[in-house]
Regions:
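N-terminal targeting leaders characterized by basic, low-complexity, disordered sequences
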Residues: 1-21
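Short, Lys/Arg-rich cytosolic juxtamembrane segment immediately N-terminal
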Residues: 22-35
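Hydrophobic membrane-insertion alpha-helices, especially the h-region
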Residues: 37-54
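Extracellular cell-wall/glycan-interacting regions and their flexible linkers
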Residues: 16-17, 21-22, 43, 48
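Short, intrinsically disordered low-complexity segments
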Residues: 2, 11, 29, 259-262
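Catalytic glycan-binding domains that act on GlcNAc-containing polysaccharides
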Residues: 56-269
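Intrinsically disordered, low-complexity regions enriched in Ser/Pro/Gly/Gln/His and often acidic
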Residues: 5, 27-30, 60, 192
């Protein structure tokens, strides 16, 4: 049989290369997977902390604004004005002058004025009390006789100085009767000394016959009044006389007599 002839063009037989394809060379700058995940986790935590920080800042800013609004409302309610030399109130020079003359704490006088007239010289009640400290006609006339004011007229009580002078004299009178106790003096200023004396004799109201805590006062307008006055007293001490620690301590104890008077031994003259 004829043998097949070989192709004139010899076939090129390519043998498979015995060389292996080298593996991809690792990037020396590439972080390990575990480290990448760790950094990602830390970033998430950091973002959470930053978010919490800004939320807290926003919360604190809001609270600070609320606090400042409340503070300004308090100052306005108590007629306190802020200044470079500290806080002040309307008629403060007159209040301090006659408080000193009659051995009273000026903060207590201010508390009475705030709750009687809200610092209005033209205030007049339905029962005829008049002026800053709301003095009744018969009481004012009696005081005029005691201090020797021969020119007294009831219309003079619209005058701030006259009203504060008369009111401070009367507070001093009540202070001597009730040992400078803020609750008793404010109660007597509102309801009369006879009423307070009667309460002191009632063991159900006063356990010692000398003092009456506000919460033991009989329910009614006088109890509410005494509570407001004593609260205002403490606030005026804090706002107007924060550095007078000895006097402020007296206010905290409910004493309306000035520390100067106590030191001089004339509180109950």
């Amino acid at each position: 049989a004829p043998r097949p002839t070989q192709s004139a063009v010899p076939q090129r037989v390519e043998s498979a290369s015995t060389e292996s394809v080298p593996a991809e060379t690792a990037d020396p700058n590439r972080l390990p997977l575990w480290l990448t995940w760790t950094i990602a986790g830390l970033c998430i935590v950091l973002l959470g902390l930053l978010a919490a920080h800004y939320l807290m800042q926003a919360y604190l800013t809001t609270r600070a604004e609320e606090w400042e609004t409340a503070r300004q409302n308090t100052l306005s309610y108590y007629h306190v004005v802020e200044g470079e030399n500290g806080n002040s109130i309307t008629y403060q020079p007159l209040i301090e002058r006659y408080a000193a003359e009659y051995n009273l704490r000026p903060a207590f006088v201010a508390a009475i004025i705030r709750n009687e007239s809200s610092f209005r010289t033209d205030a007049e009640s339905s029962v005829g009390a008049r002026g800053l400290m709301q003095l009744m006609p018969d009481t004012a006339e009696w005081i005029a006789g005691k201090i020797g004011d021969s020119n007294y007229s009831f219309d003079h009580l619209y005058d701030a100085e006259t009203n504060i002078r008369y009111g401070c004299w009367y507070l001093n009178y009540l202070s001597k009767l009730f040992r400078g106790d803020a609750v008793l003096v404010s109660s007597a200023y509102h309801a009369g000394q006879t009423t307070v004396t009667r309460w002191l004799s009632d063991k159900g109201i006063s356990s010692d016959g000398v003092t009456i805590p506000v919460d033991k006062l009989p329910d009614g307008p006088t109890k509410q009044y005494a509570g407001r006055v004593t609260t205002s007293y403490g606030i005026y001490e804090a706002l107007l006389y924060p550095n007078e620690s000895a006097e402020a301590a007296g206010a905290a104890a409910g004493d309306i007599v000035s520390a100067r008077a106590v030191r001089a031994g004339v509180a109950n003259q």
